[in-house]
Swiss-Prot record:
Record's protein name: DNA-directed RNA polymerase subunit alpha
Any GO BP: DNA-templated transcription
Source domain of life: Eukaryota
Region (Alpha C-terminal domain (alpha-CTD)): 245-316
Stretch list, region Alpha N-terminal domain (alpha-NTD): 1-233
Keywords: Chloroplast, DNA-directed RNA polymerase, Nucleotidyltransferase, Plastid, Transcription, Transferase
Keyword Ribosomal protein: no
Function: DNA-dependent RNA polymerase catalyzes the transcription of DNA into RNA using the four ribonucleoside triphosphates as substrates.
Record-stated family: Belongs to the RNA polymerase alpha chain family.
Species name: Cyanidioschyzon merolae (strain NIES-3377 / 10D)
EC number of this enzyme: 2.7.7.6
Length: 316
């Protein structure tokens, strides 16, 4: 490989950065100078990793006092259980879980508007809520809304699975801190001169991670994937075919445990070793005197059992 194809001075610039909302952060990066194929390869690779491989925290199950299924309604609560679960799914968490799963609890007495700020995580949890104003439900009476939520950390989108725990309702896990990625390739401006190409990369996150950190993690993941390819050691041992041929040359047809009829026919044809036998096709063996189809099948069965191979049917 010609290393001169790669730029000597690779530059990356954060051209724009905007916090539209606690759960909506945007940044644009320019990577230059690159050839067109380099920019396209980097853009595609980074986009796929950003959207599917970065980890985050999500609620994956909930247990609500007084609710046994998703279609249940709760006394004094305006939303049904299904709507509450959809609202819980929108909560964005930041941090690292010290253990999985982690339980977070909520208990509010009405009348009240319940938001994510009401959650209390376990003492040893480092998970924090990005937007504590995230709406969950409204209690119109003096009734109590009480629930426990199960937090997990992973990557990608995971469909809800039936919970083995009693009264727990599963929720789809959204472990996707990056909401959207866009890229395109354009001319690069270096020292006021247009040279080569530039990769323009736009990243939108849900606030649990900054676009800069997302890009850093994606690059680290790609490096981890590709690094082993630089130190591959190819074994120079014999191939399977070479090993099989070595076995054939040293093995006599007596070791195939053939019937007396088949054995005698082969011996009369001056076939003494398995290597000799493998020079024949099934069609050629059938041409031998007193060697019929049953004998051919017997030979093939013996070869399969002993050496995991068979005779060719016809001459190539």
């Amino acid at each position: 490989m010609c290393m001169s194809q790669f730029p000597i001075e690779f530059q990356i610039e954060c051209a724009a950065s905007t916090i539209n909302h606690a759960r909506d952060i945007y940044a644009k990066f320019i990577l230059q100078p690159l050839s067109y194929t380099q920019a396209l390869t980097m853009g595609n690779s980074l986009r796929r990793v950003l959207l599917s491989e970065l980890e985050s925290i999500s609620i994956t199950a909930v247990r609500i006092a007084g609710a046994s299924h998703e279609l249940a309604t709760l006394k004094g609560v305006r939303e049904d259980v299904l709507q509450i679960m959809l609202n819980l799914k929108q909560i964005v968490w930041r941090g690292q879980l010290k253990k999985q799963p982690t339980i977070t609890r909520l208990k509010v007495q009405g009348p009240a508007i319940v938001t994510a700020a009401a959650f209390q995580s376990e003492a040893n949890s480092s998970a924090n809520i990005i937007d504590t104003c995230q709406y969950i439900a409204t209690i119109d009476t003096q009734d109590i809304l009480e629930m426990e939520c199960q937090l997990e950390q992973s990557s990608g989108y995971r469909l809800a699975k039936p919970s083995e725990m009693i009264d727990w309702l599963p929720i789809d896990g959204v472990f996707m801190p990056v909401k959207r990625v866009n890229f395109w390739v354009d001319k690069a401006l270096v020292d006021k001169v247009l040279v080569d190409k530039a990769l323009h990369l736009e990243i939108w996150t849900n606030g649990s991670i900054s676009p800069q950190e997302a890009l850093h993690q994606a690059a680290r993941i790609l490096t981890h994937w590709f690094n082993p390819l630089q130190t591959l050691e190819w074994k120079t041992s014999h191939t399977k075919n070479e090993q099989t041929m070595a076995q054939l040359s040293n093995m006599l047809i007596e070791e195939l445990d053939l019937s007396v009829r088949a054995y005698n026919c082969l011996k009369r044809a001056q076939i003494h070793s398995v290597a000799d036998l493998m020079q024949y096709t099934q069609e050629e063996l059938l041409a031998l005197k007193n060697f019929g189809q049953k004998s051919v099948e017997e030979v093939n069965k013996a070869l399969e059992q002993k050496l995991h191979c068979q005779l060719k049917k016809y001459v190539d």
